[in-house]
A protein has these predicted regions:
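Aromatic-lined carbohydrate-binding/catalytic grooves of carbohydrate-active enzymes
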Residues: 15-157, 162-167
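Gly-Asp-aromatic-enriched flexible segments
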Residues: 349-426
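Extracytoplasmic, non-cytosolic globular domains
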Residues: 146-196
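Carbohydrate-binding surface patches
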Residues: 270, 276-279, 284-286, 320-350
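Solvent-exposed loop/turn segments at secondary-structure junctions
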Residues: 1, 31-36, 93-97, 162-167, ...
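Structural recognition of the beta-strand scaffold that forms the well-ordered cores
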Residues: 23-30, 35, 86-91, 151, ...
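Glycan-recognition surfaces
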Residues: 115-121, 134-135, 141, 145, ...
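Catalytic cores of secreted or luminal carbohydrate-active enzymes
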Residues: 271-320
Length: 426
């Protein structure tokens, strides 16, 4: 939320030098670029926003100095285009509340901001905007003026936020934005956010947007990765050229303005990159490119995997056997197939036949003790598996069983006294 022009140029320089040849091409400035006092990960109800006299947002000059004197993003856009890349921005749905408070005119019309604002349509998490009432005269003109300005800046990509949910309430504004882009005279990729979009809107969103989020913000947690398997499967029938279900950014490398590195393990990062590619989700890197490590670079420059994302055909789920999941796709101009196989299970599965010893069944209805006599002197790891075979309840077995070691000298030690690497419920 607080990125600057200098930081944006640094990202673009890295992409041009290291990633462009692998197909990476968009540099996108995210939310709050119009707020001089923006802070990381926060929105302020009383924030002063930069606007022109027609209620159209402008870059904050203190953060984007090339925007001075009403130049907007043209200077930054020209810089990025000069590197052979494309430039994008984030945009909140609607019209700035400040424009409504000042009742600024809608460019080229007799109408004003208060004539078109819907004060009952507000974002639940960002206080900057009111929705636009598309039944009012001047409403389409306002969106036309916004995208005329954006096109004049040389913008190639716009992510419109607070518009994809609740989807049906915002359909008219989505249609208005599509019309505004189509008449602006410049090809602009339209991305809609946030998810989770509803499947019954699939035909509408594919007609009006080039990509749309299928989830809320995706961050670096395994549970978030796991949930994307089902979402990408559900949206797969609606993917088509020029219309892409978007599983969100790749949270790799250094994140949060350099404050931390990704929490995903290397295997989990491989899973994300592979799933996004075989499902042909748009690829947007969310980390600081200038701090890219060798492993992250290897993910972003794997030409074989990127070819699947960019060029494969007929991508589809193949099977899901107890969360052992496979996707396949056709290789263009070939009878060959791509195959991606994932272990999406949350927990380690232990095969009983590999156990050195399995105790008798112990339940509330059986004897309360079971003696286990097994030599573990050469073992380096121990797994205690509590199986709910007896009565269907597993979560409290470790409590009431109170398992313990009994040593040769007769002394005892509860297993709970030992340091365990991890615990999972079955």
């Amino acid at each position: 939320t607080a990125i600057t022009e200098a930081q944006t140029k640094a990202q673009a320089d890295y992409m041009a030098a290291n990633l462009k040849k692998f197909g990476w091409e968009y540099i996108v400035v995210d939310i709050q670029w119009y707020e001089p006092g923006a802070k990381d990960h926060g929105y302020r109800p009383d924030a002063v926003l930069m606007m022109d006299g027609f209620g159209r947002l402008q870059p904050a000059v203190n953060r984007f100095p090339s925007s001075a004197d009403g130049k907007g993003f043209k200077g930054l856009s020209d810089y990025i285009h000069g590197l052979g890349l494309k430039f994008g921005i984030h945009l909140m749905r609607g019209i700035p509340r400040q424009a409504v408070d000042k009742n600024l005119p809608v460019k080229g019309t007799i109408y004003h901001a208060r004539d078109i604002a819907n004060k009952n349509s507000v974002c639940p998490w960002n206080p900057d905007m009111y929705g636009v009432d598309m039944t009012k005269p001047g409403a389409q003109d306002y969106y036309n003026s916004v995208f005329d300005l954006i096109a004049a800046w040389g913008v190639d990509f716009v992510k419109v936020d607070d518009i994809a949910r609740p989807y049906h309430e915002h359909e008219k504004e989505i249609e208005a934005i599509r019309r505004a882009i189509d008449r602006a005279g410049r090809p602009i990729v339209l991305s809609l956010s946030p998810g989770e979009n509803v499947l019954d809107a699939a035909d509408h969103v594919a007609k009006h947007a080039n990509m749309w989020r299928i989830s809320d913000d995706f961050w670096d947690r395994w549970l978030a990765v796991h949930d994307q398997f089902a979402r990408l499967k559900n949206w797969n029938p609606y993917r088509q050229p020029g219309a892409w279900p978007d599983a969100d950014m790749l949270p790799f490398g250094v994140l949060d303005q350099g404050k931390r590195t990704t929490r995903l393990t290397p295997d989990e990062q491989h899973t994300v990159m592979t799933l996004w590619s075989i499902a042909r989700s748009p690829l947007m890197h969310g980390g600081d490119l200038t701090k890219t490590d060798d492993f992250t670079r290897s993910l972003l420059t794997n030409a074989d995997v990127l070819a699947v994302n960019q060029n494969s055909l007929n991508n589809r789920p193949l099977f899901d056997h107890d969360e052992l999941i496979a996707w396949t796709a056709d290789v263009p101009d070939s009878e060959d197939k791509y195959l991606a196989v994932f272990n999406a299970r949350d927990r380690v599965r232990l095969a009983a036949e590999h156990a050195r010893y399995a105790s008798p069944l112990v339940t509330r209805a059986s004897d309360s003790k079971a003696a286990i006599d097994v030599d573990v002197s050469d073992a380096s790891r121990m797994f205690l598996v509590l199986d709910p075979t007896g009565d269907g309840v597993a979560w409290d077995y470790g409590v009431w069983l109170a398992p313990r070691f009994v040593f040769a000298d007769g002394s005892e030690r509860p297993l709970t006294d030992y340091q365990w690497t991890r615990t999972d419920a079955i």
